[in-house]
């Protein structure tokens, strides 16, 4: 992988991690266009995902600071309940990560037809949430946190947008748009860091995780994903507040159909 390819794919990851159009799907499409496969693709995916975690920490630092200040009061306050909800939302993705990790990695190598189909499913979810009758719950309940977590677990499928799935599910459950967007971006931090930790452990054991990717390409990809992620995170929060997800539904539908057509006609 050249540094230029890493730059393009890093920008793609940073933008699509927060926009409800599936970062994994677009990375798969981009990797296919550049001819990047196997361990090289997986290693780069991990690096740019960690970069977007740092984007979230920067953009939502005030919310994170609020959570930790309240958490260390050691009381059952709003901040503690928020952390509990995040932990609850992690249960489904944790189960998938522990018991179905190999299956997920196989799915990522299953080709662009799956990506195209999942992009169509993302479009359907966004459309349903857009036309759903609006309700405004004061806060995200434990039950809603678990259901949103289920949506996140399902979104391990390449092409099925994680942010799109979690935000659409939360909106269908009647949650506040702004609070839901923040929760969606914060709940993904622990799973991504957990995945990164597992791969660090592999490297300590002497397993080759990075493949043949040059260090420069990894660094360029990381910075590109971080900077573009900061921009996209702020933008997406405003988009959710204004309820303009239908435009992304149209985009995902078109992208899905084009991907399927190109795959079948190849």
Swiss-Prot record:
Bacitracin is thought to be involved in the inhibition of peptidoglycan synthesis by sequestering undecaprenyl diphosphate, thereby reducing the pool of lipid carrier available. It catalyses: di-trans,octa-cis-undecaprenyl diphosphate + H2O = di-trans,octa-cis-undecaprenyl phosphate + phosphate + H(+). Keywords: Antibiotic resistance, Cell inner membrane, Cell membrane, Cell shape, Cell wall biogenesis/degradation, Hydrolase, Membrane, Peptidoglycan synthesis, Transmembrane, Transmembrane helix. Catalyzes the dephosphorylation of undecaprenyl diphosphate (UPP). Confers resistance to bacitracin. The chain crosses the membrane at residues 41-61, 80-100, 107-127, 140-160, 180-200, 213-233, 245-265. It comes from the Bacteria. It holds the Pfam family BacA. It is a multi-pass membrane protein. InterPro entries: UppP. GO terms for biological process: cell wall organization; peptidoglycan biosynthetic process; regulation of cell shape; response to antibiotic. GO terms for molecular function: undecaprenyl-diphosphatase activity. GO terms for cellular component: plasma membrane. Belongs to the UppP family. It is found in: Cell inner membrane. Its EC number is 3.6.1.27. This is Undecaprenyl-diphosphatase. PANTHER family: UNDECAPRENYL-DIPHOSPHATASE (PTHR30622:SF2).
């Amino acid at each position: 992988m050249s540094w230029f390819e890493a730059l393009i794919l890093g920008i793609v990851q940073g933008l699509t991690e927060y926009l409800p159009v599936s970062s994994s799907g677009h990375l798969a499409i981009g990797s296919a266009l550049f001819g990047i496969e196997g361990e090289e693709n997986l290693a780069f995916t991990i690096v740019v995902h960690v970069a977007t975690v740092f984007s979230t920490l920067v953009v939502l630092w005030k919310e994170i600071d609020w959570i930790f200040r309240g958490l260390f009061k050691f009381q059952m306050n709003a901040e503690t309940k928020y952390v509990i909800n995040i932990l609850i939302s992690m249960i489904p993705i944790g189960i998938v990560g522990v018991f179905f990790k190999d299956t997920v990695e196989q799915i990522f190598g299953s080709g662009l037809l799956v990506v195209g189909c999942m992009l169509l499913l993302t479009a359907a979810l966004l459309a349903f949430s857009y036309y759903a009758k609006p309700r405004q719950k004061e806060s995200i309940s434990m039950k809603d946190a678990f259901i949103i977590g289920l949506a996140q677990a399902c979104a391990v499928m390449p092409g099925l947008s994680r942010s799109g799935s979690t935000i659409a599910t939360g909106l269908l459950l009647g949650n506040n748009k702004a609070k839901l967007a923040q929760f969606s971006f914060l709940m993904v931090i622990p799973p991504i860091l957990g995945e990164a930790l597992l791969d660090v452990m592999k490297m300590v054991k002497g397993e080759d995780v990075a493949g043949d990717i040059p260090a420069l390409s990894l660094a360029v990809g990381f910075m590109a994903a971080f900077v573009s992620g900061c921009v996209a995170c702020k933008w997406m929060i405003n988009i959710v507040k204004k309820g303009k997800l239908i435009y992304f539904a149209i985009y995902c539908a078109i992208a899905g159909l084009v991907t399927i057509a190109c795959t079948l006609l190849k």
